[in-house]
Amino acid sequence: FKVDEEFQGPIVSQNRRYFLFRPRN
């Protein structure tokens, strides 16, 4: 995925944060 690194950058960070902070069910 190398289309808009400037736009996808922050989104990936948010996704990583969501996965890191999501409960382990």
From Swiss-Prot:
Subcellular location(s) per record: Secreted
Biological processes, Gene Ontology terms: regulation of smooth muscle contraction
Main location: secreted
Residues the record lists as Asparagine amide modifications: 25
Keyword Transmembrane assigned: no
Keywords: Amidation, Cleavage on pair of basic residues, Hormone, Secreted
InterPro entries: Neuromedin-U_amidation-site, NMU_C
GO cellular component, as recorded: extracellular region
Molecular-function annotations in GO: hormone activity
Tagged with keyword Secreted: yes
Pfam families for this protein: NMU (PF02070)
Family indicated by similarity: Belongs to the NmU family.
Record's protein name: Neuromedin-U-25
